[in-house]
């Protein structure tokens, strides 16, 4: 799980926008497969503090256990099939960690660093600017672990478990050390979870997320983060955008009419301070869908892509081409692509191998009108 958090952080363009869940209406309820409440609570704490947007399936807070493992059995009618108790640990845990998500931007927007991992224990850290959260989880309900000298970006000092011992977490001490601070030994009893946090005031505009990440001129865009209040300006690349409204945590703006089509870095400027960059894909106009098809032989590790003369196809740059085509009936490949409507489009199919080596389709450019 720790490895997955790390590689998706590198592989996903917008990893903090991924919706995460323990269960849903299409799968077996988590309470059916995991009967230990200690492990159940540890999983819930992980869901609510790891990267992504957590999706809580109704009844999770009540430890619902259906009659069998089918997805249908899990779709209970709460009013008749379950009592509703606001004193369950799961209910209180969801509320407490949702509060932390609102309070500390490291959960919603932060990067992830794995500080310790074995088959039962995972310690990870989330960081966004100077906001830091350290989470230690023991999923094994009947075995304790002691981890010495855990590295952390938490400043030196004493830290209280944010959950107040709800999952038996204890307070920790962080000591200054050469290179990076470390904690004293952390002992985790069976099923124990500890959450420690440092919430810093924003000194510059900080972009945490943008919704959506793609649009055409005139589309409304929401920028989320911290330090976004006051007299600010927003740019898409080098083009300034109109700001409709702004607060400390949200800006409402629009894609500028003269923004350059393709990938633009959004920035927020406040006085002399400029925010971090956030990539936004400016479309070249109204869109429609074209499904591209090709019959092509490939070697192991090769995939087929499309590159063409419009920004949506990379403007002839193979590094900005489409995603790989699909091939459920190899050697037939296809891919639905959003392209500018009513436009003559020139394109080619290309092959890329695992090393990124590109082989261009021979012959004249293919031409369609969308």
Question: What function would you assign to each model-found segment?
Answer:
Residues 257-262, 339-343:
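Surface-exposed, short loops/turns at beta-strand junctions within beta-sandwich domains
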Residues 142, 152-157, 225-232, 297-302, ...:
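Short proline/glycine-enriched turn/loop motifs at strand-loop junctions of beta-rich domains
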Residues 6-9, 74-119:
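Aromatic- and carboxylate-lined catalytic core of secreted/periplasmic carbohydrate-active enzymes
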Residues 1-53, 58, 62, 69, ...:
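Alpha-amylase-like alpha-glycosidases and glucanotransferases acting on alpha-linked glucans and related
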Residues 174-204:
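C-terminal beta-strand-rich structural cap/linker in extracellular carbohydrate-active enzymes
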Residues 201-230, 273-286:
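Beta-strand/beta-sandwich contexts
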Residues 297-344, 352-369:
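Aromatic-rich carbohydrate-binding modules that target alpha-glucans
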Residues 115-153, 256:
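Carbohydrate-binding surface patches
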């Amino acid at each position: 799980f720790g490895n997955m958090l790390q590689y998706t952080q590198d592989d996903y363009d917008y990893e903090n926008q991924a919706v995460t869940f323990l269960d849903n209406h299409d799968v077996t309820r988590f309470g059916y497969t995991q009967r230990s409440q200690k492990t159940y609570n540890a999983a819930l704490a992980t869901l609510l503090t790891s990267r992504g947007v957590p999706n809580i399936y109704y009844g999770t807070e009540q430890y619902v256990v259906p009659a069998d493992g089918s997805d249908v059995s899990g779709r209970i009618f709460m009013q008749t099939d379950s009592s509703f108790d606001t004193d369950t640990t799961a209910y209180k845990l969801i509320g407490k960690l949702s509060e932390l998500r609102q309070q500390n931007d490291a959960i919603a927007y932060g990067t992830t660093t794995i500080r310790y991992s074995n088959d039962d224990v995972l310690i990870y850290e989330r960081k966004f600017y100077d906001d830091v959260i350290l989470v230690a989880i023991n999923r094994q309900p009947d075995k304790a672990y002691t981890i010495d000298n855990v590295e952390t970006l938490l400043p030196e000092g004493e830290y209280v478990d944010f959950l107040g011992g709800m999952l038996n977490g204890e307070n920790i001490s962080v000591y200054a050390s050469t290179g990076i601070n470390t904690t004293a030994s952390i002992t985790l009893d069976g099923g124990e979870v500890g959450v420690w946090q440092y919430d810093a005031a924003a000194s510059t505009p900080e972009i945490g997320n943008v919704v959506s990440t793609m649009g055409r001129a005139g589309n409304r865009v929401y920028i989320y983060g911290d330090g976004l209040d006051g007299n600010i300006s927003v740019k898409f690349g080098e083009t300034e955008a109109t700001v409709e409204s702004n607060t400390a945590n949200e800006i409402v703006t629009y894609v500028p009419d003269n923004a350059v089509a393709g990938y633009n870095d959004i920035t927020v400027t406040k006085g002399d301070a400029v925010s971090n960059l956030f990539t936004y894909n400016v479309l070249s106009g109204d869109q429609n869908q074209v499904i591209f098809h090709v019959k092509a032989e490939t070697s192991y590790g090769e995939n087929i892509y499309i590159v063409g003369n419009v920004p949506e196809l990379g403007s002839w740059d193979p590094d900005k081409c489409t995603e790989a085509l699909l091939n459920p009936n190899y050697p037939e490949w296809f891919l639905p692509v959003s392209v500018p409507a009513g436009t003559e489009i020139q394109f080619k199919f290309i092959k890329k191998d695992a090393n990124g080596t590109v082989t261009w389709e021979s012959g004249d450019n293919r031409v369609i009108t969308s």
